[in-house]
């Protein structure tokens, strides 16, 4: 197998820092009180969930987390976030469709990383 594209190599503190910021953004988005969540057209919520977990998957892989453990962590995090939203005083509701959007985003991110890994750098 060819070496991965140079842009996809783990970049130590930089990649871990970007992952940490992405996790912090996800915490802010997923656990903001309902009163702080802006209204949006139908479907935007699912797109936000998908893109958020896509970003978590990509930054997690860039930080060197292997695909299978990362996938399991993201599926669990997605489920936990929906349970917390459902049972907490955040004035939010848990949703299976949000969880599915999260899982789809994580899956797309992992697939995109895998595809990019297999590309050869331009010469």
Predicted feature locations:
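Bulky hydrophobic segments
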Residues: 1-99, 103, 107-123
């Amino acid at each position: 197998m060819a070496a991965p594209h140079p842009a996809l190599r783990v970049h130590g503190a930089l990649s871990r820092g970007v992952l940490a910021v992405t996790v912090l953004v996800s915490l802010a988005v997923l656990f903001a009180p309902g009163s702080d969540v802006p209204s949006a057209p139908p479907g935007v919520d699912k797109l936000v969930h998908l893109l958020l977990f896509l970003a978590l998957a990509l930054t997690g892989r860039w930080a060197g987390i292997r695909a299978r453990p990362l996938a399991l962590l993201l599926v669990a995090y997605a489920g936990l976030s929906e349970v917390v939203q459902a049972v907490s005083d955040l004035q939010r509701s848990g949703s299976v469709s949000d969880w599915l959007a999260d899982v789809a985003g994580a899956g797309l991110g992992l697939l995109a990383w895998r595809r990019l890994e297999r590309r050869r750098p331009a010469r």
